[in-house]
Every structure is written in C-alpha cells, then in structure tokens.
Amino acid sequence: MRVLVRYASVMEACGLTVPPSRWRLALARMANRPAPESRPPRILRLRPTRTGLVLRLKLRPGQDAFDVAATTDRLRHSFGVYGVTSRELRSGVVEVRMTGYDVLQRVQMPATAETRPMRIPVALREDGAVHYRDYRAVPHGLTLGATESGKSVYQRNLVAGLAPHHVALVGIDCKQGVELFPLARRFSALADNPDTALDLLEALVGHMEDVYQLIRAEQRISVAVPDAEIAADIWDLREDLRPVPVVVLVDEVAELALFATKDEEKRRDRIITALVRLAQLGRAAGIYLEICGQRFGSELGKGITMLRAQLTGRTAHRVNDETSANMAFGDVSPDAVLAAIQIPTDTPGVAVTGDSTGGWARIRAPHTTLREAVNICNKHADRTPDVPALAAFRPALAPLPQARVPLSKTAPATA
C-alpha cells in the first residue's frame, strides 16, 4: 500500500517521469484546463512475494531500462525497503524487485522450487529469487573462492541437487578425496590424485568420441526428414538411445596444473589438454564441467586461459585479492569484480555469480553439512548409472547396512 500511495511522487523525485505529450498539452489548452502532470512508468502488474514485492513496469516513450537500473538505490531509500533490483523483460517492459529484509542473512529456500532435467536450485539471490544451475543453458562453470569462503558448501549443494536426477557424477578431488569421497555412493567415477585423474579424463574423452559416433549414426539426415528431427546432440536422440549425461566436478583444479619434475609437466599438459577438449566438445555429448579452485590464472601455465574461456558460468566467493576476482569476472563485468572483493569474511557462502552476457547477482547457498549431503547421496545411490567407459574408476564400496526391524516388542522382565 505504501508503494502504491507514494509511487507517482517517488518516481518524479527520482527522475523517472516524462513530460506530457504535445497533444495532451494542446487538449488541456483548448479545454482551458490546468496542464497535465508528468507521467511515471505504468504499472502492468504488482505481485507480493514472501520476501517483498515485484512490479512490472511499462516504460514511457523516451525511457529505457538503464534509467530504472541507475535509480535503484534512490528507489530503495525512497520506498524504505532493504533492496531494489531491476531487469529488462522485453522491449519497453522492466521488472523491479523490492525486498523488505536481507534475504542472504539467513537463507531459507522455498519449500517447492521448479526443477527440470539438468536444472537444479542451488542458492538464493539477493532479490529473493531462486538461483538455478542450468547445465543445458550454461554447460560449463567456474567456481572460485578462498579458504573458508563457502566454496565446498556450494559444491555439496550441487551434488545434493543432482543426486535425484538421471545423471552420472564424476569427481576429481586431489585432496586425497576428503571432499567428494564421502559422497561416493552417488558417483559413477572418482579420482583422488593427478595420475588417476589423467586416466579418468582420457577415458571421458574416449566416451565423448563414442557418443559422437552414436549421434552421427542416428542423425537421420535425408531429403524426406524435417529439420526438427535431425539429431545434433544427445537431447535430440530417442530416449531409449540417449546416453546418460555426465557432470564432472573438479575440486582444487590447481593441483592438476602444478608440477615439479619433467614427468609431472608432461602429465599436467595431458590433463589440461583433456579438460580443454571436454570443454570445447563435451556439451553436445552431454558432458558438463564444474571447475572449482582458489585461483585460476595464467600463472598455472599454458592452456589455462584457453580452458577458462570455455567456462561460461562464473561464481566467485570471497577472494583475498582483486586479481583473483578478475580471473572470474574481468571479462564479464567490472562491477562484479568490485562486488566479489567486498564480500566480508563473516558471511561464508555469499558469492557473486555472472555469465558472459555481463549480468551478475549476489547469491548465498543454504548451509548443507557433509552429513546431510552424505544422507542424500546414500538415499539416491540406486540412481547411480553404470558408464562402461568409466567402470575402472567406479568406487568400490560395501553395501549399505540394512536396518533390522524387530517383529515383536520385547516385554520387560517382571518380578
């Protein structure tokens, strides 16, 4: 109600009104009436949410979306809300989100969130909306963050979100497996050292080539086949022929790029070459990369910048220097770099996410303990697919113990 009552005056004070048109002025002059007032953007829809309010505005002639984006801070103070963000929906229509409190202080994900294959909710945005990791839209991602920045919790949320889906999880954890091996029951392949990681990545490259052979055989290119039925990736194949998609999670990628001897340098070059090939060619074969690390710059050697250029999705938790933030957002948005280095140390899990379009937002993943992630992976262990090319890297685990249920209650002894 406060927003509706003060809407016209606030918009005029913030410079978001346009003067009346000539025909309205002429009509008022002919009717001997007062000159009409300036007009603010028209409200198309007003929708209350659990965190605030969403306005959909129709811009007046001469206005653009940048005018609204440039005044969000003034709108925040004028309406007395915690935060205001805006985004352009289509030409001439802007959505303005107002939040009444800091939704990132205590993250509460909605009870029901929209899920689709390869699209999972992982965090909450500062405007109260759910942040999704959509592998079909953004195939490969890079996650950076210093120690104790919440990077591992974000990775756990990814695994927990993917666990119920029909997807093969492949993990490379060179910290001797302390992060990913507790979740091993939901992983189709795991590697805990650079030597095993090299063999695993080369096996993935071989699997990718086999998938392309399958797509080539099932393309169904002929004069009589409509274009819509021609297969170009695994999602165009029939469901009974479609290979299972693979998500590759790499923790502490710097461990794969460091070397001290000539033999380790050769191994490192082969690892980076395999990662670059998967990043360049893996999308159509249903192979998606999720690279995590503390730094990911050119000091890690040749091929790193080529690999980084293929990682469209960027997420940066708290970093210790501006250079690390530039590694994630230097080619995306200078404002995102500034936001990443301003994340305080007492808010682990807060991150800045962006993509190659230049858009970015602050997010925070809900705190998921390792025990909770293990329980989710154990619950969905039966959904772990068998990938023949990766069978040699399948973790060998003992079966889960079956809980014994007594058939009858034991009666207490009586005197």
UniProtKB/Swiss-Prot annotation:
Ranges for domain FtsK: 127-326
Disulfide bonds: none
Protein's UniProt keywords contain ATP-binding: yes
Domain of life: Bacteria
GO molecular function, one term: ATP binding
A family per Pfam: FtsK_SpoIIIE
Keywords assigned: ATP-binding, Nucleotide-binding, Plasmid
Binding site for ATP: G145, A146, T147, E148, S149, G150, K151, S152
Coiled-coil boundaries: none
PANTHER family in UniProt: DNA TRANSLOCASE FTSK, SPORULATION PROTEIN RELATED
Protein name: Transfer protein TraSA
Native organism: Streptomyces ambofaciens
